[in-house]
Amino acid sequence: MFDTHTVEIEWAGRPLKLETGKIARQADGAVLATYGETVVLATVVSAKAPKAGQDFFPLTVNYQEKTYAAGKIPGGYFKREGRPSEKETLVSRLIDRPIRPLFPEGYKNDTQVVVTVIQHDLENDPDVLSMVATSAALTLSGVPFMGPVGGARVGYINGEYVLNPHLDEMDESSLDLVVAGTYDAVLMVESEAKELNEDVMLGAVMFGHKGFQPVLDAIIKLAEVAAKEPRDFQPADYSALESEMLGLAEGELRNAYKITQKADRYAAVDAVKAKVKAHFLPEEGEAKYTAEEVGAIFKHLQAKIVRWNILDTKSRIDGRNLETVRPIVSEVGLLPRTHGSALFTRGETQAIVVATLGTGEDEQYVDSLTGMYKERFLLHYNFPPYSVGETGRMGSPGRREIGHGKLAWRAIRPMLPTPEQFPYTLRVVSEITESNGSSSMATVCGTSLALMDAGVPLAKPVAGIAMGLILEGDRFAVLSDILGDEDHLGDMDFKVAGTADGITSLQMDIKITGITEEIMKVALGQAQGGRVHILGEMSKAITESRGQLGEFAPRIEVMNIPVDKIREVIGSGGKVIREIVEKTGAKINIEDDGTVKIASSSGKEIEAARKWIHSIVAEPEIGQVYEGTVVKTADFGAFVNFFGARDGLVHISQLASERVAKTQDVVKEGDKVWVKLLGFDERGKVRLSMKVVDQATGQEIPNEKKKEEAAE
């Protein structure tokens, strides 16, 4: 019934198995991939023909994690998986980026990749395995795909590169880098690092590229026995159209791309485009080409002319040379009632970034396959349509916004203080108000400024820069701080963020083969110079974190209590801690290890809560004077509540220095009194005295103290 084919190899000390022919047989391509004991199913379906009028390649990648894979049941009312999590969105992008350039130009059939995690061994992250499974499924599917693609994770532990480290090993690694590519080219890099230099980062990329070569061999081996017949796809030949269009519009397009202002340049390009359309799509008579074909070739021609201009003149669209960064203006504190704020402007790209400090109860709970954990640093990136002068959809963030936010998050996180150094939850929101290239790197710079403005003790300021690379034969040009127009014209787009001393995040997308290690080294070196320049410009606004928090930020005091006292502080059903919060106004968060965080914008509220908690967990000291409240009177004395919830007896003989006939003659219920702890009787009951304390001042009376000592 099943025509099953399997290939198995040893990869980084664990078995990797690729199987096809048994599951999801109606998909164009389906591969069940197992690494260790983590299992994913990757499927590919591509329509047999493009939709009419389709002018782009509609590729969709959906990565989904099923909770049953880790033996769990989803939370929530419906008890089933809902909208994609942040990780599912990020891994979908991770799979998409290296495969998209390998579909032939002109292929516009609707194509969907679905990757499902169906088993997780809690040791091997399914993201790299999903990339491998997708590549294998595409290679087998018969869909035109110039693969296969391999992928690997690289760690850097104790000065050594580690291929596909286990999840628990990543805690010790100063690098988390995922690389993907073909036999002879690196296509994609995504990473977070702890201030590593350019040589170490490039070495990790090449180490990972070498490390996934056996995976490519395994995919080819499987394809030799299980691949479907390749679909007959021949891209249309538009060389005649391109040649004619070049003759018609080259001069005007070259002039248009000499205009440095974005709006004016766009207007000039639109005028050339209108002329081209009028020529090739006449209102009268039959047109030789469709509007989609003319539009696509015009776009292709734009890219060619910009590339030629840059390689020939070493001058950019906006008049800069290859290495110049656009003018930068940095401002902090522009929103004084927020906890920290910054406005970062680089050319026509601008971000308002606001930092907010919160308490432990503001941490985000993340329910992943590996277990529930709390995230104390949140970074949200918003890209409204007005930032590029357009109208568009508003609402929940799209994949691009989530991906850009995570890139900035990775860049900043290595420089954050530990929870012990700074016990706050941090949320940063980046509002992109203008965009003409590299808004994600503007977010990195703005986040660094806003956090320093908020008084968050960053280890060092962080900046980011977006780079491009154009390669034609043996000529190449590396572009620093690319514009939006330059973003899609290059052969390599990469974003580098870090401090003056090293890289904290690197994202790279390479679209062609032929980019050597040496070219990448030159590009990273140029990026380092640009990053240092940007840090210098940022330092004009603020050089280090402010010594104190903003006026409106909450204050947090940390204290530690014995673990066995946590129950007493919380109380039955949370009764005690609720009372403390209600009476003092402070927010209180108690960790399982006995760490207590007390937060409020008022120092008095924090101190009141601290004293209350201290009175619950500490033991009263014999000989000390405490303030208390009379809670009950009796013939033989008064019961006084002191030191938190403790009660003790002031015997009638200890109420006053003179003889007392009736307790109520001295105190009544509700009276505030000062008492001294004399000790404990044979049954452990608390013995208190009022007569040895001056009830007006709370100070001990010297003569009474001597009498008491003599009596003892």
UniProtKB/Swiss-Prot annotation:
Entry keyword annotation includes Cell division: no
One GO term describing the cellular component: cytosol
Segments forming domain KH: 554-613
EC number in record: 2.7.7.8
CDD domains linked: KH-I_PNPase, RNase_PH_PNPase_1, RNase_PH_PNPase_2, S1_PNPase
Entry keyword set: Cytoplasm, Magnesium, Metal-binding, Nucleotidyltransferase, RNA-binding, Transferase
Pfam families named among the record's database cross-references: KH_1, PNPase, RNase_PH, RNase_PH_C, S1
Role noted for this protein: Involved in mRNA degradation. Catalyzes the phosphorolysis of single-stranded polyribonucleotides processively in the 3'- to 5'-direction.
Protein name in the entry: Polyribonucleotide nucleotidyltransferase
